[in-house]
């Protein structure tokens, strides 16, 4: 992690440099988040989760994880910061790979603080963006200071009840993997009912290979097992 450049003198390496908060691609928030009680407490009872076949996270916190974050603002801030960091690993790849021609309105469901949506809007010239998340997330959203901020509006609510109407592209980055199949169907049904005719849904999640192999998606799958009531990474099938 660190390099000894002289006896008793140490310097950052490319790895430890990512733990700074002021560098491109910083993973500081991610590193801190996984050491907070919101993560290490459920992971500490992973064996119990495996034996029961369902996450014990709600037993640990006495409430759903999202309600826990609502009551623990510091940990929620680290989580939201980590999700922004995570977006930095995927947003530019998605923006380059996807054809945004003709897209008029992107609605980012569970979009956190807007980094992913902002990145897509830089590629989708002329499109408007709607950021949709829980009230406590939208309320703590930092000011977006780049040129796409004026094209973004924000709204809050519960995506199990409804989502903003009128989008022709709805994005779900690392949302579907948080929930069991029935809950995912409800989210997607609400999107279908809200989108314009001919609208599309873009889901960004890990896709597991059909057979066990050294794939980072399996670690994420374990994290979903530990942290969520029914969430998982899925295969293409």
Pin down the residues of each PLM region:
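Conserved Class I S-adenosyl-L-methionine-dependent methyltransferase catalytic core
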Residues: 1-105
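Alpha-helical subdomain
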Residues: 4, 100-237
């Amino acid at each position: 992690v660190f390099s000894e450049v002289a006896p008793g003198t140490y310097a950052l390496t490319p790895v430890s440099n990512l733990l700074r908060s002021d560098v491109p691609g910083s993973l500081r928030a991610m590193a801190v988040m996984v050491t907070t009680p919101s993560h290490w407490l459920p992971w500490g009872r992973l064996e119990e989760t495996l034996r029961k076949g369902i996450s014990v996270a709600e037993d640990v916190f006495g409430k759903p994880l999202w309600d826990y974050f609502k009551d623990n603002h510091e940990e929620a801030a680290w989580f939201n910061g980590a999700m922004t960091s995570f977006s930095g690993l995927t947003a530019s790849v998605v923006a380059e790979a996807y054809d945004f021609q003709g897209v008029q309105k992107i609605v980012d469901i569970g979009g956190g603080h807007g980094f992913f949506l902002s990145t897509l809007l830089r590629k989708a010239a002329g499109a408007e963006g709607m950021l949709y998340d829980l009230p406590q997330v939208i309320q703590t959203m930092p000011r977006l200071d780049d040129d796409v901020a004026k094209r973004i509006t924000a709204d809050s609510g519960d995506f199990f009840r409804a989502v903003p109407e009128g989008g022709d592209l709805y994005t779900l980055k690392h949302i579907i993997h948080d929930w069991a199949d029935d809950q995912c169907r409800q989210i997607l049904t609400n999107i279908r009912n809200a989108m314009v005719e001919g609208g599309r849904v873009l889901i960004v999640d890990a896709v597991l290979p059909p057979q066990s192999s050294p794939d980072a998606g399996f670690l994420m799958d374990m994290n979903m097992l530990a942290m969520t009531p029914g969430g998982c990474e899925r295969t293409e099938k």
